[in-house]
Amino acid sequence: LQLAGFDIAKPAVRLAAKALPAARYAVASSFSQPVRTGWADLLLNCFSPFAQEEFQRVLRPGGRMIYVVPGAEHLYQMKAVLYDTPYKNPVQEVAYPGFRAIGEREVQGTITVPHDQLEALFAMTPYYWKTPRDGTARLAALPELTTDIAFRFLLFEKL
């Protein structure tokens, strides 16, 4: 079994390498993975854009991909702090040419994030780039945040 992992964030790659040293890691984009064509039996893509052409290239015929996207309630309470009108994430049924959807599962829970980790969590979200300053200030003032988390695991097979 050979494992490889890629992320555009160098700290994430370092953390993964410490957690599972038997795998190989690289700082790389989903759109340009440093592996040969047809190398992968399974891809796991978490909260990254769907790089369809690159996934097609990297997966062997019949290979599978788990695509993790946020569920409707993911970080809803964080959005309630950041925005005057919080919103649920859209849940869409998607079809990608060259892939066949073969399953889906949603996992939900609640987490409490201490103050010293709130900024790091916030920085990993798209909200970081589009939140007004007053919303950012409200989040920074919290001693902790309890929020829902929701992940949709979409399973695809390469045709």
Q: Where in this protein do the model-derived segments appear?
A:
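Class I SAM-dependent methyltransferase SAM/SAH-binding core
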Residues: 1-33
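Hydrophobic beta-strand segment of the Class I
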Residues: 41-45
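Conserved beta-strand signature within the Rossmann-like core of class I S-adenosyl-L-methionine
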Residues: 62-75
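A short, conserved alpha-helix within the catalytic core of class I
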Residues: 47-61
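Conserved Class I S-adenosyl-L-methionine
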Residues: 72, 79-101, 107-159
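Short, charged, surface-exposed secondary-structure boundary motifs
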Residues: 14-15, 35-38, 75-81
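Short alpha-helical
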Residues: 10-11, 50-53, 73, 113
